[in-house]
């Protein structure tokens, strides 16, 4: 048996294409497993706790539950529309989930893995409240980037413990926060160092997840697992504390399995206690730390079975730009895609087939149109419709004796390619395999010329059509996990029931194939539809209708305090273990300065060396990823990328900007 889970969507906002990189491949994987004869339980649910939900609810004048209800129903609707079929889709604010979370936390306490500790926490004197997680913003203590309370999302990506953030400010009122002491509870993560190193050496899954985790496990610290909130799972014996959301959210995999097994008639304990199943987590790359470090340590401490594999998708870009909801670089699943009337199968195919699962996916409406029209329609759809329509018109039913052995061998090869691809989590390779078979089918049909044979040799025409029908049957079966809605329609034309079909049925030859009039499998993606969607996106990129935030006015004296100069980059090199940071040695006239800048994703060291830049020279020194920075280079932003400010003409380094 296999248990397949998906990272829980956060019930705090709408579904976008970035979400689908987890859910569509997982659904495709589960469908292929079942068609291979595997017994599978497939679960997911809404993540309903945590400070972002509480903050958002406060800002909208809603209770956390009211906000969660809205987005929980939204995700159910989206998954249904895209034919993502979980055995059970739950929510973490349910009683059954609270029960399982409390049971596991109590077990960790009883076994001595949880202890209390007085810590310094950000406190807002104006709001008169402690500021957990997203209630506080400030500076990352490790790299100096802007950070939220529990995560350095703009810099090094580290998880931040309560009280670590520097220069904290209240997210609600903007006031400067102070630190006050309070008792919280910690999980002894450091006791699991040896276990985690051994576990990660054996864990299966995608290399992007495993490599990240193996680097992080070397510097473990105990983990604060309580928060000052009213919304969440109450921590045992502490009426004013709840369990941290990253403790209770993954426990949803267990509580949702319990509910799924109630409905399916299986025993959840065999999966999570006895370890009689493979547990496979599909997640986004941004939550690898939680799933490969925190989660297995908790499970080990509470005597639960461990995940067998962690499958992490690459990130998502939109029209080549870094995904950002705030900047408009986003495609919303419902309002952009579904409401345009496009088939859910097209989006499923694009998500799976655009690139390798571990690589970054770029969502482009132009590329989307080309892939659908040139691959799905012109290759797969063309073959299926031509063959099925010809067979129906000229035969009605076809005796299948004499199917070409070469055709059967091609079908078997395709099945093996798909199965091999699934073992490597390469869903693109699986979909490429059936597209290659469709290309072969088009050539075979064209070379056989049954429309000519039927005039002179009806038996030869029948054999040719039988071979093409076998290919059509195989393609319907192989493509079904990726494009279920369309393949169900095509299956009706050959009387094929896909409900209990097996991959091996693709090369089983029936005595007779009875045909009905086939539907056109796919509708062309029209230029007008794409142009309309592109205009919507361009408008969003420009932020039309949104006013730029106005900063507080300053005096000329304030401006004159800034020492802004022209500098020349003498040397540039990337900061180790950082994707964004680059270390620069800059000549600013009277000295050479070392400055760290977050432009490594937009400029190479070679592009920067010799370049004139604008430098803020009297900025207080700071450390980024342990590297000292004494100043700042100035840049604008265009399409989500940094654009350096440079003088129009050649200017000597050290020249002041005034």
UniProtKB/Swiss-Prot annotation:
Residue positions binding Zn(2+): 140, 143, 152, 156
Motif window: 'HIGH' region: 9-19
Biological processes per GO annotation: methionyl-tRNA aminoacylation
Needed cofactors: Zn(2+)
Keyword Phosphoprotein set for record: no
Motif stretch ('KMSKS' region): 322-326
UniProt remark on cofactor binding: Binds 1 zinc ion per subunit.
Matches recorded under InterPro entries: Anticodon_Met, Met-tRNA-synth_bsu_C, Met-tRNA_ligase_1, Met-tRNA_synth, Methionyl/Leucyl_tRNA_Synth, MetRS_core, MetRS_Zn, NA-bd_OB-fold
GO cellular component, one term: aminoacyl-tRNA synthetase multienzyme complex
Keywords: Aminoacyl-tRNA synthetase, ATP-binding, Cytoplasm, Ligase, Metal-binding, Nucleotide-binding, Protein biosynthesis, RNA-binding, tRNA-binding, Zinc
Known catalytic reactions: tRNA(Met) + L-methionine + ATP = L-methionyl-tRNA(Met) + AMP + diphosphate
Annotated HAMAP family: Met_tRNA_synth_type1 (MF_00098)
Similarity section: Belongs to the class-I aminoacyl-tRNA synthetase family. MetG type 1 subfamily.
Primary role: Is required not only for elongation of protein synthesis but also for the initiation of all mRNA translation through initiator tRNA(fMet) aminoacylation.
NCBIfam families attached to this UniProt entry: metG, metG_C_term, PRK00133.1
Name of the protein described by the UniProt record: Methionine--tRNA ligase
Record lineage: Archaea, Methanobacteriati, Methanobacteriota, Archaeoglobi, Archaeoglobales
Gene that produces this protein: metG
């Amino acid at each position: 048996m296999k248990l397949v889970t998906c990272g829980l969507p956060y019930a705090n906002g709408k579904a976008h294409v970035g979400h689908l990189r987890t859910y569509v491949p997982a659904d495709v994987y589960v469908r292929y497993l079942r068609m291979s004869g595997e017994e599978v339980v497939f679960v997911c649910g809404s993540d309903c706790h945590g400070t972002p939900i509480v903050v958002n609810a406060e800002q909208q004048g809603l209770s956390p539950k009211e906000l969660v209800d809205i987005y929980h129903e939204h995700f159910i609707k989206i998954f249904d529309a895209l034919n993502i079929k979980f055995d059970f889709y739950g929510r973490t604010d349910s009683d059954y989930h609270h029960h399982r979370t409390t049971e596991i936390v109590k077990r960790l306490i009883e076994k001595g893995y949880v202890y209390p500790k007085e810590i310094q926490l950000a406190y807002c004197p104006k709001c008169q409240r402690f500021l957990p997680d997203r209630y506080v913003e400030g500076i990352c203590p490790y790299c100096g980037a802007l950070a939220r309370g529990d995560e350095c999302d703009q810099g090094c990506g580290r998880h931040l413990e309560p009280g670590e953030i520097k220069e904290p400010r209240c997210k609600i009122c903007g006031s400067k926060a102070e630190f006050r002491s309070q008792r919280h509870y910690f999980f002894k993560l450091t006791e699991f160092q040896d276990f985690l190193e051994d576990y990660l050496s054996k864990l299966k899954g995608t290399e992007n997840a495993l490599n990240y985790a193996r680097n992080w496990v070397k510097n473990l610290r105990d983990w604060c697992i309580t928060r000052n909130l009213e919304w969440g799972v109450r921590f045992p014996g502490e009426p004013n504390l709840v369990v941290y959301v990253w403790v209770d959210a993954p426990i949803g995999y267990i509580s949702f399995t319990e509910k799924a097994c109630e409905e399916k008639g299986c025993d959840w304990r065999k999966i999570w206690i006895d370890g009689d199943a493979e547990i496979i987590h599909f997640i986004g790359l941004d939550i690898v730390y939680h799933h490969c470090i925190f989660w297995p340590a908790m499970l080990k401490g509470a005597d639960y079975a461990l995940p067998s594999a962690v499958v992490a998708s690459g990130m998502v870009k939109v029209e080549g730009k870094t995904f950002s909801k705030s900047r408009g670089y986003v495609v919303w699943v419902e309002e952009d895609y579904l409401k345009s009337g496009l088939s859910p199968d097209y989006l499923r195919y694009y998500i799976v087939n655009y690139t390798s699962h571990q690589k970054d996916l770029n969502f482009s409406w132009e590329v989307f149109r080309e892939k659908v029209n040139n691959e799905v329609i012109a290759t797969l759809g063309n073959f299926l419709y031509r063959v099925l329509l010809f067979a129906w018109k000229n035969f009605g039913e076809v005796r299948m004796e004499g199917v070409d052995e070469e055709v059967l061998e091609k079908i078997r090869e395709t099945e093996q390619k798909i199965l091999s691809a699934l073992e490597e989590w390469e869903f693109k390779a699986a979909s490429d395999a059936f597209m290659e078979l469709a290309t072969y089918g088009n050539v075979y049909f064209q070379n056989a010329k049954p429309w000519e044979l039927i005039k002179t040799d009806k038996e030869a025409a029948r054999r040719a059509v039988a071979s093409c029908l076998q290919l059509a049957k195989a393609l319907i079966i192989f493509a079904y996990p990726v494009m279920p809605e369309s393949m169900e329609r095509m299956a009706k034309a050959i009387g094929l029931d896909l409900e209990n079909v097996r991959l091996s049925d693709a090369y089983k030859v029936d005595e007779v194939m009875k045909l009905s009039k086939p539907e056109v499998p796919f509708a062309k993606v029209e230029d007008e539809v794409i142009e309309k969607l592109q205009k919507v996106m361009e408008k969003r990129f420009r932020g039309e209708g949104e006013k730029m935030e106005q900063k507080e006015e300053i005096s000329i004296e304030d401006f004159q305090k800034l020492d802004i100069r022209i500098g020349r980059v003498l040397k540039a090199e990337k900061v180790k273990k950082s994707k964004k940071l680059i270390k620069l040695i800059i000549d600013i006239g009277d000295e050479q300065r070392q400055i760290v800048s977050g432009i490594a994703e937009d400029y190479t060291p070679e592009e920067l060396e010799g370049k004139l830049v604008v430098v803020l020279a009297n900025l207080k020194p700071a450390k980024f990823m342990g590297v000292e920075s004494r100043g700042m280079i100035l840049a604008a932003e265009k399409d989500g990328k940094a654009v350096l400010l440079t003088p129009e003409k050649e200017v000597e380094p050290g020249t002041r900007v005034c």
